[in-house]
Amino acid sequence: MELAMLLAKLPEAYSVFNPLVDVLPVIPVFFLLLAFVWQAAVGFR
């Protein structure tokens, strides 16, 4: 029974990470831009 209570409290515990979860999908776009900037820096060899 205490396991069910623990699982019920988990969403409240993870509500702190909501801003982080909102940012996570943007990270691959940053990697794409980083690759483009890197290639521009080396002259698209």
UniProtKB/Swiss-Prot annotation:
One family name in Pfam for this protein: PsbK
Biological process annotations from GO: photosynthesis
Keyword Thylakoid attached: yes
UniProt membrane topology term: Single-pass membrane protein
Origin superkingdom: Bacteria
Keywords: Membrane, Photosynthesis, Photosystem II, Reaction center, Thylakoid, Transmembrane, Transmembrane helix
Transmembrane intervals: 24-44
Residue stretch(es) of the prosequence: 1-8
Subcellular location: Cellular thylakoid membrane
The keyword Hydrolase belongs to this UniProt entry's keyword annotation: no
GO CC terms of this entry: photosystem II reaction center; plasma membrane-derived thylakoid membrane
Homology family: Belongs to the PsbK family.
Protein's job: One of the components of the core complex of photosystem II (PSII). PSII is a light-driven water:plastoquinone oxidoreductase that uses light energy to abstract electrons from H(2)O, generating O(2) and a proton gradient subsequently used for ATP formation. It consists of a core antenna complex that captures photons, and an electron transfer chain that converts photonic excitation into a charge separation.
Self-association state and partner proteins as the record states: PSII is composed of 1 copy each of membrane proteins PsbA, PsbB, PsbC, PsbD, PsbE, PsbF, PsbH, PsbI, PsbJ, PsbK, PsbL, PsbM, PsbT, PsbX, PsbY, PsbZ, Psb30/Ycf12, peripheral proteins PsbO, CyanoQ (PsbQ), PsbU, PsbV and a large number of cofactors. It forms dimeric complexes.
Record-given protein name: Photosystem II reaction center protein K
Annotated organism of origin: Trichodesmium erythraeum (strain IMS101)
